[in-house]
C-alpha cells in the first residue's frame, strides 16, 4: 500500500518568510504572539 509523500520539505527562506520575526511584527496578532513568548520567557521568539 503506497503512502503519500512526506509533507515537511525543509526550506529556510520559506520558514523565515512564514514564521520569521519581521513577518510577526507586521500584524497586531503577530506582535501579540511575540509578546506572549517574551512573557513566557521563551529562548526563541520566532523561527
From Swiss-Prot:
Picking any one GO biological process from the record gives: translation
| A Pfam family annotated for this UniProt entry | Ribosomal_L34
Cystine pairs? none
Q: Which family does it belong to?
A: Belongs to the bacterial ribosomal protein bL34 family.
Species assigned in the record: Corynebacterium efficiens (strain DSM 44549 / YS-314 / AJ 12310 / JCM 11189 / NBRC 100395)
Question: Ribosomal protein: is it a keyword of this entry?
Answer: yes
| InterPro entries per the UniProt record, alphabetical | Ribosomal_bL34, Ribosomal_bL34_CS
- Keywords, alphabetical: Ribonucleoprotein, Ribosomal protein
Q: Where do the record's region annotations for Disordered lie? A: 1-28
Which Gene Ontology MF annotations are present? structural constituent of ribosome
Could you tell me which PANTHER family the record lists for this protein?
LARGE RIBOSOMAL SUBUNIT PROTEIN BL34M, MITOCHONDRIAL RIBOSOMAL PROTEIN 34 FAMILY MEMBER
Protein name per Swiss-Prot or TrEMBL: Large ribosomal subunit protein bL34
Give the record's GO CC terms. Answer: ribonucleoprotein complex; ribosome
Amino acid at each position: 500500500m503506497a503512502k503519500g509523500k512526506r509533507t515537511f520539505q525543509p526550506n529556510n527562506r520559506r520558514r523565515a518568510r512564514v514564521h520569521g520575526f519581521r513577518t510577526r511584527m507586521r500584524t497586531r496578532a503577530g506582535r501579540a504572539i511575540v509578546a506572549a513568548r517574551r512573557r513566557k520567557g521563551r529562548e526563541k521568539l520566532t523561527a
